[in-house]
Amino acid sequence: MGLAGFARPLQWFKSQWLWLLLSIAAFWLLMRVQVEWLWFGQFDWQGMLLRRWLWQLGGLLLALLVVATCQLWQRNWIKLEGASNLAEPALPLHGWRYGLGLLGCFVVVVGDLVLLTRLAWLACFKPFALGHWWSEPFEDIWALVIPLSCVFISICVMLGNARGGRIAHLMGCFCFSISIARGWGLWSLALAIPPTGIKEPLLGADVSFGLGQFPALAFALVVLLAQLVLTTSTTIWMKLAQPESLSDWVFKGLSPRQCDVMRPLIGIILLTLSALLWLSRHELLWTQNGTVAGAGWLDAHLILPLRSLASLAILVLAFLVIPFPWIQQRRLWRLIASIIGVGAILLEVLLAPFVQWMVVKPRELKLETPYIIRAIKATRKAFQLDSITTTLINPQPQLTQLDLEQGASTLRNIRLWDSQPLLATNRQLQQLRVYYRFSNAAVDRYRFVPDKANRQQVMITARELDQAALPKRSRTWLNRHFVFTHGYGFTLSPVNTRAPDGLPDYFISDLGTSTRLEGSSELGITREDVKEAVPIGRAALYFGMLPSPYALAPSKLKELDYPVGDKNIYNHYLGSGGVPVGHPWQQLAAAMYLFEPRLLNTGSLTINSKLLIRREVRQRVSAIAPFLEVIGDPYLVSTSVNSRDHDYQAKQNQYWIVEAYTSSRTYPYAANLPDGRPVRYLRNSVKAIVDAYSGRVHLYVSEPRDPIILGWQRLFPDLFKPLEEMPSSLREHLKVPTDLFNVQVQQLLRYHVTDPRIFYSGDDVWQVPKELYGKRQVPVDPYHITAQLGSQESSEFLLLQPLTPLARPNLSAWLAARSDGDHYGKLVLLRFPSQTPIFGPEQIQALINQDPQISQQFGLWDRAGSEVVQGNLLVVPLGKALLYVEPVYLRARQGGLPTLTRVVVSDGKRIAMAEDLGEGLRALVDGSSKKAVYLNRNDLPPIKAADQSN
């Protein structure tokens, strides 16, 4: 039969396997699509998912059109007849010139493949980072780039001629298509983002161009340029690497016909490069190379004109390359345009450092002043520092009884419990089983007594299920996914009281039928007040902040609800959330989605069973709105929601509040964060509410003037609701996120200065002060207080950050973020007079530790085998004075329970230490308490901390 007889069956066999593999891939994709469709269906958001798919499909079709055009051009060019003896060849190569051309072409192909592979990698795993791909970390891509480069080298070596280049081109086309399709978020936002009406002063573009259009255009031009260059270089490679050329080390050259067909593609490449250079002028607006952020004098007067000139020269060159018949003396003009374009680029590289050193540096302040003003204004705008209300206060040097009376509402909520000691106590007393875990303690406030103007500040900790803590013998597949499915309940503690033994008081503790609700006679709160203000209801936590595997519920197996003594109480999931898996085809889809074949043979599923996935609430919000950044820890709220709101279940009381942000790296003239993170614009634009039982998600827009979120609202109008539609019982628990506040504090350290001369000299830079916590010196974190702001009669919930001058410990200012009612999100800067030194946290702690009686008591406790932990030092405005409060905890050196042992108070002039805050204040004001240690500062040696620098 011969070899030819076997060729046809072999070809048939290969095609059958190919179709089988394609069918399996299509079926697997269909199953994944079904699960995703049903998952979004639980929120009635299939329309949003469909729009996302359509955007990706549109991008894919556009990419395939470009790819098909490139493939068609390449195939037609390859078919053209090469150089002959009758025609004068172009670019003939031989000897070392041929080797150099071969090497150069190879380097271009590999470089293009590396770039396209990197973009495809980001598109698959970080699609919303494509707009700033050049600044993304590169280390995790090497695992893909190096093998691909080796594969290409092997292909070229083994296959030799055209096939190696063709496969490389197909690889690049595949990466190009993935990048375009998965970059849907860039294109859609660029089309939908509204103008802000704010023009940047250098190029006159609206700020929204930098926030939305620039990232999309930059990515589109880069990926298109890479694809076109790859098409050209692989095509040339296929000609250079012909067997006869490799054997003779000679390339005969290109025929005139081949050159004519090549010129339009070269012209398009040059047009794309020209557009990219023109767009790069906007990149000057967010550089960090000069004195301040954004374009400086050198950028505006040298680099900007040079880039414009280079772009125009390459544009002219592109038209000269394309064979238009009416253009005469083509070679001369091409040479002139090339010299101008390359010369402008070289001048930018070579001349800019010289001009900076010779012209700008000697007159830097004068030349850069207009640009410093722009940078200050833009940075303050980008981080909402321009809306800060500044108040000057001059506190009295000594606390009086009148201050205590005026600040009575503040004193009722002075926080004495830090989150770390409270968590340590909860983990030993309230976790109750090894598989429960308290992840964090969130500060919040509840209105226990309706007729009181002020709400009680509390700490709430959710008791979540930590499957990693299950004993090994209990980590079976059925236990992990059918039985141990949820956490249960929470603890609620007042921040300002303690039990007689020094442990925390609890409004709510324990769990299940053993749940204890207690009032506080000290605070005037009854058990009924707690029961009314903090309903518990159905306290199972199926969704939380800990990573959790998928769960299948309800099923034939009962789920562990909570333990009671030595017994366990079991229950079934009754929520509406989840993906139905009651029917065989749904189970097949879930098994393929999870790569879990055991689902098909478990026998434990019922017709009502549901698959619960994405149970970590931050991951859940990110899956629904991947264009939002979910930063920081969510916090739990337990409250009643009006049953008239059909989006909420009447029996459900526990909800997670998740903070979601929009950000940008391309806000004109705005500065990076001082810690180096390339964030130049940040808004806490969305508050997400997640039902802890059913997983239902609600997204509310908290920054309606943010152009980025306005763009997403245009694209997905059904996804977001205005903040006013959030139930009032949940809105009462909103607070300014600590992560956003920290970013604003970092920028304020330098950008509180608006005078360009002072800003340039750096004479008025602030810093976050430090304090001694335990045995370590740490920066003072922002802390929540319920206090009166200025001359207000009632207190409000504030997030406060004290600030000191750089390298000096005296207090310069407070930044306070308001969270209550109509004042939500407003920033207030309380500035202290510079001529009157106000003690900062370091100095007060130095006073405390130099007090002979206090230090003696600390030493006695240490020698007795206990460890003294000095807690967070709070600086609180009280009347017309300042009050410094530091809790002191005592714990055994080996895993003991932290107990609140003492409270140290000071007004900067006097110090008192007592068993509770009331005794300490009485001692501080009039020295009347016999239970307190009291000392006047005049009796102390000079403060050592005053001479320390940070």
Swiss-Prot record:
Transmembrane segments: 20-40, 53-73, 102-122, 141-161, 173-193, 209-229, 259-279, 308-328, 335-355
InterPro entries to which the protein is assigned, alphabetical: UPF0182 (IPR005372)
Keywords assigned by UniProt, alphabetized: Cell membrane, Membrane, Transmembrane, Transmembrane helix
Entry membrane topology: Multi-pass membrane protein
UniProt KW Transmembrane keyword: yes
Subcellular location: Cell membrane
Gene Ontology cellular-component annotations: extracellular region; plasma membrane
Family classification: Belongs to the UPF0182 family.
Family matches, as PANTHER family: UPF0182 PROTEIN SLL1060
Protein's recorded name: UPF0182 protein P9303_14611
